[in-house]
Amino acid sequence: MATTATEAAPAQEQQANGNGEQKTRHSEVGHKSLLKSDDLYQYILDTSVYPREPESMKELREVTAKHPWNLMTTSADEGQFLNMLIKLIGAKKTMEIGVYTGYSLLATALALPEDGTILAMDINRENYELGLPCIEKAGVAHKIDFREGPALPVLDDLIAEEKNHGSFDFVFVDADKDNYLNYHERLLKLVKLGGLIGYDNTLWNGSVVLPDDAPMRKYIRFYRDFVLVLNKALAADDRVEICQLPVGDGVTLCRRVK
């Protein structure tokens, strides 16, 4: 999920019922879905996701589950989706903004060809190094160029060199929601025509459809407006074709067409 400590949450998100009371939607970090039925989501995981999950990704998921901010991780079904997507578009040069322990990063690295690359950025190297042994064990660490620190300066440096324009096949953004639009404007210069940008958490725990006065955790409420603005902006942006999917916490794919 995101890279900022303010976006970390306790065990699980909560929703308000008709009486305004709080109720827990899911009881474990393995459940990260907007589906109303826990049983249905567990069926998806048990039937189609976990049996096909590479051992290295399973190990990284289990390591991450012990971290106090484990809700920041990409869900297993979304990791499977990203892995398939990378293969479908034949991506070779990719970027990830917001790494956390690297579950989505590993999903991407495993999908890339041997000479594929990922420019990965996160403000917290410690979290990345927590998952690094799993990435190294999978034999894909050589594909990753990890940069610790804010992503915007790195993007600006890339844009300053003409050779980087339109050079990336795929970018996955799972970081500070208040900068998503800043990332978007820069990434449109760096992603090739026909290339994809994926924005994570675009349904933001389902809060995008809640009334303003609905009970919400503080960090959900704080970033909710940024997500709402992003969704509206992407829907109106004729430089991209978009597809918003209820995978994980919501992911919006943008295909650059201009």
UniProtKB/Swiss-Prot annotation:
Catalytic activity line of the entry: (E)-caffeoyl-CoA + S-adenosyl-L-methionine = (E)-feruloyl-CoA + S-adenosyl-L-homocysteine + H(+)
Source species of the chain: Zea mays (Maize)
Residues engaged in binding S-adenosyl-L-methionine: T74, E96, G98, V99, S104, D122, A151, D176
UniProt feature, compositional bias: Basic and acidic residues: 22-31
Family assignment from sequence similarity: Belongs to the class I-like SAM-binding methyltransferase superfamily. Cation-dependent O-methyltransferase family. CCoAMT subfamily.
GO molecular function, one term: metal ion binding
Coiled coil: none
Protein name per its UniProtKB record: Caffeoyl-CoA O-methyltransferase 1
EC numbers, comma separated: 2.1.1.104
Positions of region (Disordered): 1-31
Cofactor note: Binds 1 divalent metal cation per subunit.
Annotated function: Methylates caffeoyl-CoA to feruloyl-CoA and 5-hydroxyferuloyl-CoA to sinapoyl-CoA. Plays a role in the synthesis of feruloylated polysaccharides. Involved in the reinforcement of the plant cell wall. Also involved in the responding to wounding or pathogen challenge by the increased formation of cell wall-bound ferulic acid polymers.
